[in-house]
């Protein structure tokens, strides 16, 4: 026989006014913060990924594809020199 841990049931939590007051503020705030993080370009800076206009430069229009099985580091060095 299991004992009572003193925790509220899930149904009791999601039907309470306090739950919805807190979450009606936090869920939209997280959505807006994520949208601003991506739309301002901060996500590109934080994660180091190239922006959409930086994938192809004037000097390099081909896809940077590593084809050498035994010298991939040399090919990667060539690709990164063009950045």
Swiss-Prot record:
The keyword Electron transport applies. Its cofactor is heme b. GO terms for cellular component: chloroplast thylakoid membrane; photosystem II reaction center. The keyword 4Fe-4S does not apply. GO terms for molecular function: electron transfer activity; heme binding; iron ion binding. It is a single-pass membrane protein. InterPro entries: PSII_cyt_b559_asu, PSII_cyt_b559_asu_sf, PSII_cyt_b559_CS, PSII_cyt_b559_N, PSII_cytb559_asu_lum. It holds the Pfam family Cytochrom_B559. With its partner (PsbF) binds heme. PSII binds additional chlorophylls, carotenoids and specific lipids. GO terms for biological process: photosynthetic electron transport chain. SUPFAM superfamilies: Cytochrome b559 subunits (SSF161045). Keywords: Chloroplast, Electron transport, Heme, Iron, Membrane, Metal-binding, Photosynthesis, Photosystem II, Plastid, Thylakoid, Transmembrane, Transmembrane helix, Transport. The chain crosses the membrane at residues 21-35. It is found in: Plastid, Chloroplast thylakoid membrane. NCBIfam families: cyt_b559_alpha. PANTHER family: CYTOCHROME B559 SUBUNIT BETA-RELATED. Heterodimer of an alpha subunit and a beta subunit. PSII is composed of 1 copy each of membrane proteins PsbA, PsbB, PsbC, PsbD, PsbE, PsbF, PsbH, PsbI, PsbJ, PsbK, PsbL, PsbM, PsbT, PsbX, PsbY, PsbZ, Psb30/Ycf12, at least 3 peripheral proteins of the oxygen-evolving complex and a large number of cofactors. It forms dimeric complexes. This b-type cytochrome is tightly associated with the reaction center of photosystem II (PSII). PSII is a light-driven water:plastoquinone oxidoreductase that uses light energy to abstract electrons from H(2)O, generating O(2) and a proton gradient subsequently used for ATP formation. It consists of a core antenna complex that captures photons, and an electron transfer chain that converts photonic excitation into a charge separation. Belongs to the PsbE/PsbF family. This is Cytochrome b559 subunit alpha. It comes from Pinus thunbergii (Japanese black pine).
């Amino acid at each position: 026989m299991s004992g009572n841990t003193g925790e509220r049931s899930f149904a009791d939590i999601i039907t309470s006014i306090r739950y919805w007051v807190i979450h009606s503020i936090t869920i939209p705030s997280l959505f807006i913060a994520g949208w601003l993080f991506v739309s301002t370009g901060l996500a590109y800076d934080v994660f180091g990924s190239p922006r959409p206009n930086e994938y192809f430069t004037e000097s390099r229009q081909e896809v940077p594809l590593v084809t050498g099985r035994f010298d991939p580091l040399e090919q990667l060095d060539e690709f990164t020199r063009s950045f």
